[in-house]
Amino acid sequence: MFLLDTNVISELRQGKPNQAAEVRAWAQRQPSSRFFLSAITLLELEQGIQALERRAPPQGSALRAWLAGICLAFSGRILPFTEKTAPVCAALHIPNPRPDRDAMIAATALEHGFSVVTRNTSDFANTGLAVINPWLSSTPSHQSMG
């Protein structure tokens, strides 16, 4: 199973200009039922959309509709951050703190035994996760970042 990072779900948006062909090709080779999102990814998307709605309402409105479609498409496959996830996340900050959202996404993936799919592989270094970068056409199915 794959936990898609924010940059991946954003890249896969239909009609996105300059969409990376490697990412689309990677996604098309996988059964979509294996794709999951973290509630933290929804937070990041929502934050970006709210900011865009303030400065460019038509574009913000278009992305709001896109996000509604994402939530519908991923119904039952959006993983929450829970009381079981919290200690896993806390441990990822010891001995070296990392950005909270990255740690929360990593902890969610660890809790469920999922791989993380991201362009920002260094954000998940030393977590013990299998990390996939679909922008690299030569990326193996799993790269261990432990």
What positions do the PLM features span?
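Residues at secondary-structure transition points
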Residues: 18, 36, 40, 58, ...
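Short, well-structured N-terminal submotif of metal-dependent ribonuclease cores
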Residues: 1-37, 51-69, 138-140
